[in-house]
């Protein structure tokens, strides 16, 4: 099947360049780090933690508001509107070109299609790439910007039956369910219950690619597994990571595959009951897949790394309070971040509501004596944790999705610590006295 393709660049609903607004700043009273509020505009949305938000040069970060697409200068953090286009859904920035990719869904009808666009970040000129069927979701762009990848299900199944929409404060599905005796589940349990219902439905799905130049659509793999979270390698244009979605203790979650459907590889194999792995992401050099690993769930916490070339593994251990919804890694791969979690989440952390900076520390050989089979074993380490932001007022139904700035000097995240959702940045270095 070939989708409709439009090669002509067009400028659609482009706003005149706006004056950049300076961010509001303060010093976090508990950590001493400088925090900036970049935007609290209605509908603000900072991209998911493993989506690229930066231009190739690292000078601008893209994000979404109810009015369209905005950019933040990564040196000054001044914010301006790029594209006035209500209804646009921001996808990601290009790895090679200064391009913001976004989608729009046609209004009305059961067969409403989704159109994929590319906007020049400097000129705001827009071109159409392709039209995909209703229910399709574009998740990722490959390293040389020749292919988009997405997934589609044969039918829709709302995760929360009879839901009126999303939680206004968090922008997330308002999961709710009851135990057999009628008692209401906490949010985290209700979410697992609804995810399990979707997994058991075994809805036929497909992963596909779209040629960015021609719009041609090609199938990669079909399955009744719940396929989700596609991520191209940031350096290898044909290597695609994806997941089997559902309760993590039931599924073999993390997989890689080539765009021609070959070399399907399972990244992690469970070794104990209730062991879980997920929230996977690439290292910037494309050599390592990192993921949250718990052995077992809710008891022992690791950030695990898998070398895609050698299958060598490195695991960093975390304390319960340091477990985080999502982790990330700096561009130079020397630092990691974690965005914490609340007491109802999987770690049940009594004091976990912090934005963290992690310094990796290897576990050394005792007396310099290396085991004979050490090279075939998991390389273990720990994290030295530093608290950057007090997230005590955060409602973690809104996931912070922290990411490092390209220069490694800031951590950018989304939070509702002041009552409503906003995009923030925290400086990693302590302010000069």
Predicted regions and their residues:
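Asp-box/WD-like beta-propeller blade repeats and closely related beta-sheet repeat scaffolds
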Residues: 87-88, 103-205, 219-222
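Structural motif
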Residues: 68-71, 108-117, 157-164, 202-208, ...
């Amino acid at each position: 099947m070939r989708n409709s393709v439009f090669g002509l660049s067009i400028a659609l609903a482009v706003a005149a360049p706006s004056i950049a607004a300076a961010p509001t700043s303060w010093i976090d009273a508990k950590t001493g780090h400088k925090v900036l509020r970049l935007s609290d505009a209605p509908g603000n949305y900072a991209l998911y933690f493993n989506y690229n938000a930066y231009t190739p040069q690292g000078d601008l970060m893209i994000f979404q508001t109810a009015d369209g697409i905005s950019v933040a200068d990564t040196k000054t953090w001044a914010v301006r509107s790029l594209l006035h286009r209500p209804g646009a859904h921001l996808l990601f920035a290009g790895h090679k070109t200064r391009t913001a990719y976004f989608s729009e869904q046609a209004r009305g009808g059961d067969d409403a299609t989704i159109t994929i666009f590319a906007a020049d970040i400097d000129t705001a000129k827009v071109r159409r790439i392709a039209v995909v069927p209703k229910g399709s979701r574009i998740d990722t762009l490959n390293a040389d910007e020749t292919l988009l990848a997405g997934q589609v299900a044969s039918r829709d199944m709302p995760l929360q039956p009879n839901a009126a929409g999303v939680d206004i404060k968090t922008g997330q599905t308002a999961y709710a369910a009851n135990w057999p005796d009628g008692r209401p589940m906490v949010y985290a349990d209700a979410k697992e219950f609804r995810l399990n219902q979707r997994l058991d439905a075994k809805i036929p799905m497909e992963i596909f690619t779209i040629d960015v130049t021609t719009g041609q659509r090609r199938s990669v793999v079909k399955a009744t597994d719940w396929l989700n979270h596609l991520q191209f390698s940031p350096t290898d244009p044909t290597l695609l990571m994806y997941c089997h979605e559902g309760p993590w203790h039931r599924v073999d979650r993390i997989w890689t595959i080539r765009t021609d459907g070959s070399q399907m590889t399972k990244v992690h194999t469970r070794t104990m009951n209730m062991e879980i792995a997920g929230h996977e992401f690439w290292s910037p050099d494309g050599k390592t897949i990192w993921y949250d690993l718990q052995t077992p769930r809710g008891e022992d916490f690791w950030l695990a790394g898998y070398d895609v070339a050698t299958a060598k593994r490195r695991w960093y251990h975390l304390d319960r309070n340091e477990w985080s919804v999502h982790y990330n890694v700096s561009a130079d791969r020397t630092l990691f971040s974690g965005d914490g979690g609340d007491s109802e989440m999987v770690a049940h952390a009594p004091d976990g509501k912090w934005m963290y900076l992690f310094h990796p520390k290897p576990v050394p050989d005792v007396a310099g004596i290396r085991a004979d089979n050490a090279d075939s074993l998991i390389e273990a380490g720990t994290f030295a944790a530093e608290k950057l932001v007090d997230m005590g007022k955060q409602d973690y139904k809104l996931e912070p999705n922290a990411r490092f700035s390209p220069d490694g000097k800031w951590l950018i995240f989304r939070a509702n610590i002041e009552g409503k959702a906003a995009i923030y940045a925290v400086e990693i270095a302590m302010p000069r006295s």
